[in-house]
Amino acid sequence: MNKSPLLFKGLISIGIFTLFAVLGMLHLGVQYIDPSFAALWYPYEIGLAVTAVALWYTLLRKEIALNFSINFNKDFFITLPIVLIPLLLLVYVLFTSETLENEKLAMFFATSVAVGIAEELTFRVAGYRVLLATGSSVKKAILLSALLFSLFHLSNIAAGQGVEIISQLAITFMMGVVLAYIYYKTESILYVIIIHFMWDLSLFIVTAFTNADSLLNAVSIPIVIGYFIWAMKNVLKLKK
């Protein structure tokens, strides 16, 4: 395999995806943390998901195959809480909120699915997998793809987000390490899409339908930090 063209195609995929996201942010002018974000953003996010699929299919498909099966092995069960905890948050909201609207729920669901597909294909496939296929070590590929994933969220500046973006960059870097490590261990793009989808769906619904933002932060931040520490310890032990 000629590695340079593949690396170039991976970078082109990430660049085009990021450009489209920034243009969408500039047009909408609504921040990611805004309760109305998902409702306004979902047509753009579906477009981004289609773009990510098209970029993989046209540029990367021949060199980077995708595995959609999920193996119920040790690594799956170790990481299962990262799926179940946002699910419990969603159940809590569904049973306690009196302001749920079916139309908004459908939009949040569609947006979250699209986010999971778009960002995992871009940063775990065009990022991590391409880096791995072009000679990077697993450790380097995980950390660099997580950094790219974090820096991508600078696009929120286009929507007017201020210094609070620093904390978002830190959280997204940690989550990027966790997702890339889980992808390395499971080799299942479907599983990391599901994790990404569940976290975004819980974020959108909790912020839109409740005043439980503090509960969301109290639950989600320790989980992300805990799994980041677990993933980083294992990443740093890797010899390849």
Predicted feature residues:
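Functionally important transmembrane alpha-helices
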Residues: 166-221
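Membrane-interface helix caps and helix-loop-helix hairpins in membrane proteins
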Residues: 92-106, 156-163, 207-214
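Membrane-interface helix/loop boundary segments of multi-pass membrane proteins
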Residues: 121-144, 184-188
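Small-residue-rich transmembrane alpha-helices that serve as helix-helix interface/gating elements
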Residues: 44-48, 171, 214-234
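Membrane-interface capping segments at transmembrane-helix boundaries
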Residues: 60-66, 230-240
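N-terminal membrane topogenic signal
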Residues: 1-15, 75-78, 137
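Aromatic-anchored segments of alpha-helical transmembrane domains
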Residues: 17-26, 85-93, 146-155, 197-206
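Alpha-helical transmembrane segments in multi-pass membrane proteins
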Residues: 6-58, 83, 106-107, 111, ...
